[in-house]
Amino acid sequence: MKKKVLFICNHNAGRSQIAEGILNYYYGDKYEAFSAGLNPTESVNPYTIKVLREIGIDISGKTPLHVSKYRDEKFDEIVIACDYDLDNHELPATERITEKK
């Protein structure tokens, strides 16, 4: 069974989108990656789309999501890719939280 990983950053427009795209592309046989933001923007940063496209990963159809979308899901790991106060945010259930600032 694939391990579920959720990447979270401030806007879900850059770092978390890159992490989700790379993990699914290279290790999609072992992991199922998702991403969300604490304060999502309206669209993914165009440079994020461009950089991933350069290595063969297409995320042009992705839109930033709020972390609450995954409130009722359970993840094997949540990776926090920002420096943000998480006290005011309800995170999904997980076995492990990793902070990468």
Region locations from a protein language model:
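Phosphate-binding/catalytic loops
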Residues: L86-K101
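Short, charged/polar "capping" segments at the starts of alpha-helices
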Residues: T41-V44, D85-H89
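N-terminal Rossmann-like NAD(P) cofactor-binding module of classical short-chain dehydrogenase/reductase
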Residues: V79
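Local beta-strand N-terminus motif with an aromatic residue
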Residues: F75-D76
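Residues at the C-termini of beta-strands that transition into short coil/loop
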Residues: G37, C82, E99-K101
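Short glycine-rich anion-binding loops that position phosphate/pyrophosphate groups of nucleotides
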Residues: H11-A13, D83-L86
